[in-house]
Every structure is written in structure tokens, then in C-alpha cells.
A protein has these predicted regions:
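Cap/insert and terminal regions of metallo-dependent hydrolase folds
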Residues: 201-291, 362-363, 367, 385-453
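Core dinuclear metal-dependent hydrolase active-site scaffold
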Residues: 2-66, 149-207, 327-328, 346-347, ...
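Hard-cation-handling environments
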Residues: 241-373, 428
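A general structural motif
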Residues: 233-237, 313-325, 341-344, 379-384, ...
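Active-site neighborhood of phospho(di)ester-bond hydrolases with catalytic His/Asp-centered motifs
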Residues: 39-41, 68-77, 84, 96-99, ...
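Pre-active-site segment of Zn-dependent metallo-hydrolases
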Residues: 20-25, 32-94, 98-146, 200-208, ...
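Metallo-beta-lactamase
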Residues: 110-173, 305-332
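Acidic, Ser/Thr-rich peripheral helices and adjacent loops at domain boundaries
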Residues: 118-122, 127, 300-316, 372-396
Length: 466
């Protein structure tokens, strides 16, 4: 049974998750009519195994899963949805609303997450002498599955507490959604919008273009790229990115492309095919493209567009660790696509040990990297990288591809938040200093346009009354 409601209070938002201070661990609590909803339930993911474990455990204690009446999920990236496993493990019994079509991929994501949690628990015990039982186990997958409710896009749907939920396409990744929550309070109706992660420029045939949110009293909006240097022209810079990929394939021996398993890996395969760069032949054969990620492998097999790149590219899908090790230790000319994109986990780290020391190799980054990740260190010129306790020399060639990100860039954020209508905009999902500056700039722009909308940079644990 869902949690019982108790007490009465004026409706408010509580910025409880890590997305109030950074770009990971998304969760915002909505309180109304004695109901407690969570919008997103993500995991905190940085480059510190022990710190992440403790942060996720502490976040769950703050959320108090047993008191949650419902959860609204915007999309399936781990930092937005895989905290569901820890929540049900701690007793949450609540309906979980997700965009239509999401269930097959969510199940794959959860199965992979449970394996990683178990592995991380062993690492903390063996390497750090810390007893840290997994925050969730295999049985918790079924607990999540039994509470899932798929909600169609564009349909006002009644949910727990008498509220109504409408999903709008976000343009971020497959099945990604913005959410609008309509809450009846006395004789009035409050409308709260959540952009989640979004992109205003379509980049993949599997992702419908963004639908602007309707007028809302409050919008909780992401601003990942609130740094004004994060500007690019999709048409011009995609051409540049394709030229970089083409040149790298012909110039370097081994190319590592760290990426997220969901959406990014598939987008990279699509670009590799369309650039025709992989038609470079060695001994009469196209150079191999390795997709080395168990999660990406399973998502690839379940992808809605039934991508079949085995025939288009010399694509080799790697599932077992033994196969991965053979690829890592080989010196053949190859392109290796492996997770994770920020190099805070996954097989990309194992490949990195072999790729970095050799100046004949290259690393091509294709997305955002938080300041506390290995990807950030490398992108910012670090010549020595600590990998699994070993100091590795970085002699490889490093490139950053700007147009693969599934987030809106600085200019697109500015344009979108001027386009939609709201009384208040609460900014989340950004490095805090950038978010504050972005809020000031946007507020000044709105004032010059004669608009009365207010913009605030949400702070950790802040409550905002509706």
C-alpha cells in the first residue's frame, strides 16, 4: 500500500537532491494536500566510490522512502531514476510514473545497477576495509517493477493525491520527458513544471523534438551548461566534430570514445556510419568498432529503432570481461566505445590504462564531465592520471566533441527560458557558481523585456512555497 498521508501544510517544493548543488542525484520533493511526491529519484555519481555510497545512503535517509506517496520519473539516466532501487529497499511503496515505452530499458538499467552495487560493496570491503552492504539487491528490481505506471505523452493523467500529470517531450534521450503537475489547492489550481534534462535541437531520429511547456506557476529547470563558454552551432560544429572523427580514424592507431550507455553510444554509432570514416581498411577489412559495455550491449539489443550496425560497420559487441581484456591488451587499429562518459566507472577506465601512455592513440570525449571526475582531469590537460591506485602517464591525443551532448547549450537555455511562460523559475542541475551567474543574466534579460517572472538559483535543502 502507498504511504499514508498525515498532517496538513501549504504546498511547497523541497530541493533535497544532489541536483540542487551539482548535476547528479536528482530529486525534488513536492508537498501538497498531505501528499509527498518525489520528482526523479537519482543516484549520486562522482569519482569517489566511498563518498558516493555514503552520499546515496544519506540522501535516502533524508528522503524517507516510506513516507513517499508517488514518484515521477523524467528519463532513464541513472542519476535521475536508479535511486528507485535503494528507495524500495528502504521500504518505499508508491506508484512510480514513467514516460510511456520506458519499462524495457529501465529494467535493463536496474539489472546493471544491481551488479555494480554488489561489485562496489566488495571493493569497499577488500580495498578500504569498509563494510558497506549494497543499497539494493536483485529482489528490489521486482519491487520497483510492480509499482511502475507508464504515462502517455500529451495526456493529462490522474495520479496519487488527486493531482494530474502531463508529460511533454524533452528532446534529451529516448523516452525523455518534461513533466507538468497540476495540484488543486482549495479553489485554485497550481501548475508546476519540471524540465528535467532537455535539448532544444533534435539530434537523433529516436528522440522526438522538444515540446515547450505550457504556462506554469513555477518551473524547475535544468541548466547543466549554464557556463557561457558552452555555446556551439549544431550545424557548423557537428561538421567540425565529424571532421575530427574522420581525421582521428586515419591518424591514430587506437581511439577510445568514453560515453554513456543510454543514447550516447547509439548516437556515436550513427555518426560513425554516416561519416563513412570507418571505411578505412587494414589488410582489406574495415577497422573494427568495439562496443564494450554490458549495459550498452543490452540496450543496443532492445533499442526501439532496431539499430543494426553490425552490417553497416565492422561492429563487434563485447559482453564478457574476458573479451574486453583481450581488446584492451591488443594493439590493433580500432575504435572502442565504452562507458562511462565521465570515466567514473565502467570498462572505459580499464581501456584508459592502455590508451593514455601511447601518443599514437587518441581519446574523443563526447559529453559533459563534472569537475570531480577523471574525464574532467583529462579534458583540462592533466599529464598524469591516477587509475586504480596507479599513476598513468597521459601522452594520448585528447579531443572534445561538442555536439553529442543531449543537453541544451547556454544560448539554447537562455532562449527556452525566455520562450516559456512562468511566474518563477528555480534553476537546478548545474555547478552552483555557474547557475547563480546564469540566473542573474536571465533575470536581467527578462526585466528588459518587461516580464515579471522571477529567476532563482535553487540551493540544497531549500523550500519554495507554491
Amino acid at each position: 500500500m502507498p504511504a499514508k498521508s498525515s498532517g496538513t501544510t501549504k504546498p511547497y517544493l523541497h530541493f533535497i537532491g544532489g541536483n540542487a548543488a551539482s548535476v547528479t542525484g536528482s530529486c525534488t520533493i513536492v508537498r501538497f494536500n498531505n501528499i509527498k511526491l518525489a520528482v526523479d529519484m537519482g543516484l549520486i555519481q562522482t569519482n569517489n566510490l566511498v563518498a558516493d555510497y555514503r552520499a546515496n545512503r544519506d540522501l535516502m535517509k533524508k528522503i524517507k522512502p516510506k513516507t513517499i506517496h508517488g514518484v515521477i520519473i523524467g528519463h532513464l539516466h541513472a542519476d535521475h531514476c536508479l535511486g528507485l532501487l535503494a528507495a524500495v529497499a528502504m521500504g518505499m511503496q508508491a506508484y512510480i510514473y514513467i514516460p510511456q515505452g520506458s519499462i524495457p530499458i529501465l529494467k535493463i538499467m536496474m539489472e546493471d545497477c544491481i551488479k555494480i552495487m554488489a561489485q562496489d560493496s566488495l571493493k569497499m570491503q577488500n580495498k578500504h576495509g569498509i563494510k558497506a552492504p549494497p543499497l539494493a539487491t536483485e529482489g528490489d528490481i521486482d519491487k520497483v517493477m510492480q509499482w511502475l505506471v507508464e504515462v502517455p505523452f500529451g495526456v493529462s493523467t490522474a495520479i496519487v493525491g488527486g493531482a494530474k500529470l502531463t508529460y511533454y517531450h524533452a528532446g534529451h534521450i529516448v523516452h525523455s520527458a518534461q513533466a507538468v503537475l497540476e495540484i488543486k489547492q482549495g479553489y485554485s489550481i497550481k501548475r508546476v513544471g519540471f524540465t528535467g534534462d532537455f535539448n532544444t535541437e533534435a539530434k537523433s531520429v529516436s528522440v522526438p523534438p522538444i515540446e515547450p511547456l505550457p504556462r506554469c506557476n513555477i518551473v524547475v529547470g535544468e541548466c547543466t551548461y549554464s557556463d557561457p563558454t558552452r555555446c556551439y552551432s549544431m550545424k557548423k560544429d557537428r561538421w567540425y566534430d565529424e571532421q575530427v572523427i574522420n581525421a582521428a580514424i586515419y591518424q591514430y592507431n587506437r581511439i577510445l570514445m568514453p560515453c554513456f550507455s543510454l543514447q550516447r553510444a547509439e548516437d556515436i554509432l550513427d555518426v560513425l556510419w554516416h561519416t563513412r570514416a570507418t571505411e578505412r581498411k587494414i589488410d582489406g577489412q574495415m577497422i573494427p568498432v568495439y562496443l564494450d559495455s554490458p549495459l550498452a550491449y543490452r540496450i543496443y539489443k532492445a533499442w526501439p529503432d532496431v539499430l543494426e550496425y553490425e552490417d553497416k560497420l565492422n561492429l563487434r559487441l563485447i559482453e564478457s570481461w574476458e573479451e574486453s581484456q583481450a581488446v584492451q591488451q591488443s594493439n590493433e587499429c580500432a575504435i572502442i566505445i565504452a562507458s562511462s562518459g565521465m570515466l567514473n566507472a565502467g570498462r572505459a577506465l580499464a581501456h584508459l590504462k592502455y590508451i593514455l601512455p601511447n601518443s599514437c592513440n587518441a581519446v574523443l570525449f563526447s559529453g559533459y564531465a563534472s569537475p570531480n571526475t577523471i574525464a574532467y582531469e583529462i579534458k583540462h590537460g592533466a599529464k598524469e592520471i591516477m587509475l586504480d591506485g596507479e599513476l598513468i602517464q597521459n601522452n594520448a591525443q585528447i579531443y572534445c566533441l561538442n555536439t553529442f551532448s543531449s543537453h541544451a547549450n547556454y544560448n539554447q537555455l537562455m532562449q527556452y527560458y525566455q520562450q516559456i511562460d512562468y511566474d518563477r523559475l528555480c534553476l537546478v542541475h548545474s555547478e552552483f557558481s555557474n547557475k547563480v551567474e546564469f540566473a542573474h543574466t536571465l533575470q536581467d534579460t527578462l526585466v528588459k523585456q518587461g516580464k515579471s517572472s522571477r529567476v532563482v538559483a535553487a540551493q540544497q535543502d531549500q523550500k519554495v512555497w507554491l
